[in-house]
């Protein structure tokens, strides 16, 4: 019975993003990716969502065959070409392949990628294909070696999004924040997901020279249109730190958004800015009322009698309330759930860390309040400057309320972990999730600019999406 519970623990585990992502590189000439047919010179500003992170990592090419023995994945998939911005660029350029180094507008990261890309194991757990501070991640932290992480080191990217950056950091950050230090392993605290990601800055921006901000890089490209999607990490860093990180003031969020838009406008670019989803609806956050049913179901599946499983789950819920302040309005993260199940497997009391394992009711309420205020600030900045607003918040909220996206009902796609919208980290979208977001941007831009850019074929993307149920 214990073995069966352990087997489930592996299945339930999800992870922290590597604490070693970073940047660095040597200078290079500005080689601009040729457009195929489009006359639009589009640049992407943002964080990991615009960069195309999936399953804790950033990578520009597949790893084949899969180096993890017995993994159900025949290969480890590249992440960057599947991002929403890469798909948007492709649709603007007659379907050109954003993964082709000869023409790609992306700062393609060479395998095994930056971060710790998650891969399923034969036993049903998760592992990664790179160590947290292996040579690839370590190279990313030094300007002289950062471009060694790239497949296309001589190409100046048009997607200048830096994973982990906040709205304010896009205006001012010019260096990695910390040296490469070993983070938790593939099954660890989710606080590692966003705190080190901005250390990707040098591999992405090194072509522009030293001490360059993301905004400065975008302006240097002389865009006609710039997409801006920032603010997600302001929320994640607050929620996943147990509230220890001082939250960004909403007024500052609005001022920074306005500054970014106005500087891009002054450089001759139209701006398309997106607001933020309700962060706690991401699959990595399990609402407290769902904890008992999940644990009960998994323990029954592992072989425990139904009455014992239900009583055990009730005890877990009681401990969450009394010890951690996680009541009906709180959340347990996927990493926290993994720890709970691991403790149950060896008949021990579980211990959770405030940074990354759970979100108490009070912190959840504060996070949602900030979420609302940030969206109001971003919306006001767009209105004051005439920027086009992509209402990602409304799209996701409506889809969650509807039970998901009707791509292949009932299998895909919902917003729960493993439901098809998210990749294995429960924070960054799957191929299908990114494709739906690309279409939201395309449709908004077509309406705003009276253009006819075709939508991405989401059904075709879904058909080969390794992260979506079939």
Please describe what each predicted stretch is:
Residues 58-255, 259, 463-468:
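Conserved SGNH/GDSL esterase-like catalytic core that processes O-acyl groups on lipids
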């Amino acid at each position: 019975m214990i073995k069966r519970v352990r087997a489930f623990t592996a299945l339930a585990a999800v992870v922290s993003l590597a604490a070693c992502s970073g940047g660095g590189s040597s200078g290079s000439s500005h080689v601009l990716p040729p457009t195929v047919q489009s006359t639009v010179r589009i640049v992407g500003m943002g964080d990991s969502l615009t960069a195309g992170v999936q399953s804790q990592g950033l990578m520009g090419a597949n790893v084949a065959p899969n180096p993890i023995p017995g993994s159900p994945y025949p290969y480890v998939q590249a992440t960057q070409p599947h991002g929403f911005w890469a798909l948007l660029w492709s649709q603007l350029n007659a379907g050109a392949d954003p993964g082709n180094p000869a023409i790609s507008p992306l700062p393609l990261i060479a395998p095994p990628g930056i971060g710790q890309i998650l891969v399923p194991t034969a036993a049903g757990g998760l592992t990664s294909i790179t160590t947290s501070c292996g040579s690839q991640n370590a190279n990313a932290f030094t300007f002289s070696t950062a471009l060694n992480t790239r497949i296309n080191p001589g190409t100046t990217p048009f997607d200048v999004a830096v994973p982990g950056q906040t709205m304010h950091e896009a205006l001012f950050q010019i260096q990695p924040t910390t040296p490469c230090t070993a983070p938790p392993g593939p099954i660890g605290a989710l606080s590692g997901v966003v705190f080190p990601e901005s250390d990707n800055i040098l591999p992405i921006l090194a072509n522009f020279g030293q001490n360059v901000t993301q905004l400065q890089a975008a302006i240097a490209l002389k865009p006609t249109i710039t997409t801006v999607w920032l603010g997600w990490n302001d929320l994640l860093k607050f929620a996943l730190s147990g509230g220890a990180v001082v939250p960004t003031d909403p007024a500052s969020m609005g001022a920074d958004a306005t500054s970014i838009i106005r500087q891009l406008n002054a450089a001759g670019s139209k701006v398309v800015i997106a607001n933020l989803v309700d962060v706690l609806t991401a699959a990595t956050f399990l609402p407290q009322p769902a904890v008992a049913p999940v644990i009960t179901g998994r323990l029954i599946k592992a072989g425990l009698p139904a009455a014992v499983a239900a009583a055990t789950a009730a005890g877990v819920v009681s401990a969450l309330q009394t010890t951690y302040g996680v009541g009906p309005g709180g959340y347990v993260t996927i990493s926290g759930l993994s720890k709970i199940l691991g403790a149950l497997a060896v008949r021990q009391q579980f211990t959770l860390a405030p940074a990354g394992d759970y979100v108490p009711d009070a912190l959840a309420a504060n996070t949602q309040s900030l979420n609302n205020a940030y969206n109001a600030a971003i919306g006001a900045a767009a209105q004051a400057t005439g920027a086009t607003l992509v209402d990602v918040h409304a799209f996701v909220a409506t889809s969650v309320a509807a039970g998901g996206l009707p791509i292949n009902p009932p299998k895909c796609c919902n917003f729960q972990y493993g439901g098809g919208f998210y990749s294995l980290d429960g924070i960054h979208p799957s191929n299908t999730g990114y494709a739906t977001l690309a279409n939201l941007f395309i449709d908004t831009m077509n309406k705003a600019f009276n253009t006819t850019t075709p939508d991405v074929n989401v059904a075709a993307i879904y058909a080969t999406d390794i992260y979506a149920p079939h």
